[in-house]
Amino acid sequence: MGSPLQTLSRGGRVRAALWCWTQARGLSGRQCPNRVARSLSCSRGFPVRGGRPALGGTMVSVLTESFLQGTQHFSSWDCCQSLHRHRAPVQVTDSRRNLGMDHREEGFQVGTEDDREPKASLPRGNPTGPPCSLPPELEPPTNCCMSGCPNCVWVDYAEALLRLYQDGGEKALAILEEHVTDENLKAFLRMEIRLRMQSGA
């Protein structure tokens, strides 16, 4: 029945399908419309006109497909399943998802704008104050022979600092701590400064 049924018009296919359905179910001709109407009413969204289902293109394709596949037991349950297969899938709009994404993106952009705000930079350097600046004539000596001679240029340097800063030697000690790197020389100069502070020189 496959190829002759395909060549029929829509009305012819409907009549042929209904005739096969009644023959398979063993129904009489007058019982066919009522039973078909009750069987087709199980499908949701199927239009009904005057107590009978309106056989549109969807129902025609359902009946044709069932009999082209050689189905002999065409019941109301088969009709419902076929109609569900032929129903167009519902297209879910992305408005809700886009709305949520807009809020998330907006929050993300706001956060990035806050993060891009310039932050106050912390001052660098010595927190206690700028390093001591010395006049050119009081720069640390670079011509020490490191032999321990009595006329050491570092001793002369310490005496010059004591004469410049009349504060009891504290400023001179601070300058020596900053400019002298050798620990032995630093200890020697601290001792010389304290001796001169005690002697009042």
Swiss-Prot record:
Residue ranges of every copy of the Oxidoreductase-like domain listed in the record: 134-161
Disulfide bond positions: none
UniProt region (Disordered), positions on chain: 102-134
Entries under InterPro entries matching the protein: Oxidoreductase-like_N, OXLD1
Domain of life: Eukaryota
GO cellular component: mitochondrion
PANTHER family assigned: OXIDOREDUCTASE-LIKE DOMAIN-CONTAINING PROTEIN 1 (PTHR21193:SF3)
Record protein name field: Oxidoreductase-like domain-containing protein 1
Species of provenance: Mus musculus
